[in-house]
Amino acid sequence: MSDIHAKKFSKQSSIPGMKLIPGLILAAILTAISIYAGNIPWFINMGLGTLTLAILAGIIVGNTVYPLLKPYCDEGIHFSKHYLLRAGIILYGFRLTFQQIADVGITGLLIDAAMLSSTFFIAIWLGKSLFGLDQQTVILIGAGSSICGAAAIMATEPVVNAPASKVAVAVSTIVIFGTIAIFIYPWFYQLNEHYQWLPLTQETFGIFTGSTLHEVAQVVAVGHAISDQTENVAVISKMIRVMMLAPFLLLLSRYINHADTKNGRNHQEKTPITIPWFAVIFIAIAGFNSFNLLPAAIVNSLINIDTIMLTMAMGALGLTTHVSAIRQAGFKPILLALILFVWLMAGGLLINLGIQHLFG
């Protein structure tokens, strides 16, 4: 596009909200295509749900024509990926009730706690002793893998005072393996359903998905590709894990401040802590929905809006997932994230089955 068009667009974009429109339109187009394709029998039989198709379409466009559109669409895509995702998760509470949350119970809580702590400590141990990575990179990758992906990395960044380059590396590794997992998890579930290797029901697989996948959106995509029950349980399990971000950041901040004091590097200002308020509101909405105060028609409309928001967020996530991110991340961070990814799947499966056997 010419400089004249770019300047003209820049002037028009001075109007509040105008800069969001091109990106929102692009995300909406991907959403419409994905919803249509998601109802095609072939995709249904392949276990490719609407959200999975949205991120796949986003990746294809993101690595082909999107670089040309990015100057015009970037702000709207960023808005979709961050704010529509959180709004979608908040509205997801209208699909749930406290009774369903109680059904996950102590088992889901213990599994989430075990996965978070084990994954983070493995990241610290391997990252420092085996790969010799710096503490900031290790903590960022560990937080992203053990809690909630890019959101956890962005929340951890001010605590460790990491530069933008290290944040980008950590986010790249999380997005790469989280995206791969979107396709592996439904495939593994279908194989296990056929061969009956492990005693996994739709509910227990939902807990496994929520306790091991990186991003909230990825959890929704995997659960959606299997069944409504799996999706509901997976999101509940994941949101319990996301809620653990706040105490994790508090403990991490205290640890870093203690280490800095021990090493003679006192900070004059307290490290800011980011609390995932969208997770708190999600729980509040689920509680409100438990009382059945709204007519069913309104709740169904909110659920439809929620589906559109989440699909737009997944498309936006795909648009910003670039193949070049693998090269930018480097070998050691990628290898660390790969090992953590394998642990989340294999170790997570063992922890899930073990705790469910003891407390289920």
Curated annotation (Swiss-Prot):
Keyword terms: Cell membrane, Membrane, Transmembrane, Transmembrane helix
Membrane topology: Multi-pass membrane protein
InterPro entries in the cross-refs: UPF0324_pro, UPF0324_YeiH-like
Main location as per UniProt: membrane
Protein localization: Cell membrane
Membrane-crossing residue ranges in chain numbering: 20-42, 47-69, 104-126, 136-155, 167-189, 239-256, 277-299, 304-326, 333-355
CC per GO annotation: plasma membrane
Superkingdom: Bacteria
Key word Membrane present: yes
Residues annotated as signal peptide: none
Entry keyword Transmembrane: yes
Family assignment from sequence similarity: Belongs to the UPF0324 family.
Record's protein name: UPF0324 membrane protein plu2856
Native species: Photorhabdus laumondii subsp. laumondii (strain DSM 15139 / CIP 105565 / TT01)
